[in-house]
């Protein structure tokens, strides 16, 4: 689980970035259910971030599997050919990082179900 904390007054740009990342996460989580290709989940978040003008500031995958280790395959990425399966636990962690300004990442773990997912964090 990752949260972003701001110390001090919030600038409009930071508020916009936070809102974009939060919405990107909601869109990705909305795609999760057994049988969906992981790249579709990635695109739901990545496409939204790109549409808001921040695409070049999101340089990693949307998430990854969680099991005995914190970071496990399969990856929720744009190149993944894997499908979500009931019972999988994965992270959904879109982010925007702007050099010289700062960044926002919001990460939650979800349990994949047949009809969607259960947010665990």
Residue ranges and their predicted role:
Residues 1-121:
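Active-site neighborhoods and metal-handling regions in enzymes and metal-associated proteins
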């Amino acid at each position: 689980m990752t949260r972003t904390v701001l110390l001090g007054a919030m600038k409009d740009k930071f508020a916009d970035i936070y809102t974009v990342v939060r919405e990107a996460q909601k869109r990705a989580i909305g795609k999760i259910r057994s049988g969906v290709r992981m790249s579709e989940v990635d695109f739901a978040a990545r496409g939204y971030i790109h549409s808001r003008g921040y695409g070049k500031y999101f340089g990693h995958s949307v998430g990854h599997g969680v099991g005995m280790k914190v970071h496990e395959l399969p990856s929720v990425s744009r190149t993944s050919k894997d499908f979500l399966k009931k019972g999988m636990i994965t992270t959904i962690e879109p982010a925007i990082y702007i050099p010289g300004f700062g960044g926002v990442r919001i990460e939650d773990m979800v349990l994949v179900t047949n009809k969607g997912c259960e947010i665990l964090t």
